[in-house]
Amino acid sequence: MRDVIRGRAWVFGDDIDTDQIIPGRYLTTQDPEELAKHVMEGADPEFPEKVREGDVIVAGKNFGCGSSREHAPIALKAAGIACVVTRSFARIFYRNAINLGLPLVVCPGVDDAFEDGQGIEVNLREGYVRNLDTGEELEAKPLPDFMMRILEAGGLVELIKREGPRAFEG
């Protein structure tokens, strides 16, 4: 896991729910590659064809609201999304995504600072988001060390496999 993520931004609005991230009709599979073929289809039916490895989703408030389903962050990660940056996240989505190793960053005003396809740089530890096309830099909430450890391991399960009970020590 890199501290700094650079990619191409895809901008969505407020209240993107888990049904928009991965429509319910695809919940019959657990295969990440199959889920990736339908990621964000509920918000933009053409998105699965446009997204590339390393892209970053930018959105408004309450991203990941709705039903609690691990399929949503699994689909995003499998599609190559490197990070999701929003004004705010639904709490259960936030926990699921971090636990699965998908970086999430809270950044006020981020959805107003980007257009689809613009270059984006996200610094997870220092807490900033930069529009590489305009030069605009926004303050974001840096991720705490314990979350970075989860992300660096590839998720909570992988961290526990690697460190055992030490994973929960200060």
UniProtKB/Swiss-Prot annotation:
Top EC class for this record: lyase
One Pfam match: Aconitase_C
Gene Ontology BP terms: L-leucine biosynthetic process
Domain of life: Archaea
Keywords: Amino-acid biosynthesis, Branched-chain amino acid biosynthesis, Leucine biosynthesis, Lyase
InterPro entries according to UniProt: Aconitase/3IPM_dehydase_swvl (IPR015928), AconitaseA/IPMdHydase_ssu_swvl (IPR000573), IPMI_Swivel (IPR033940), LeuD (IPR050075), LeuD_type2/HacB/DmdB (IPR011827)
Coiled coil location: none
UniProt-listed Enzyme Commission number(s): 4.2.1.33
Gene3D superfamilies: Aconitase, domain 4
Reaction catalysis annotation: (2R,3S)-3-isopropylmalate = (2S)-2-isopropylmalate
Job description of the protein: Catalyzes the isomerization between 2-isopropylmalate and 3-isopropylmalate, via the formation of 2-isopropylmaleate.
Subunit structure: Heterodimer of LeuC and LeuD.
Homology family: Belongs to the LeuD family. LeuD type 2 subfamily.
Annotated protein name in UniProt: 3-isopropylmalate dehydratase small subunit 1
Organism of origin: Methanopyrus kandleri (strain AV19 / DSM 6324 / JCM 9639 / NBRC 100938)
Taxonomic classification: Archaea, Methanobacteriati, Methanobacteriota, Methanomada group, Methanopyri
Gene designation per UniProt: leuD1
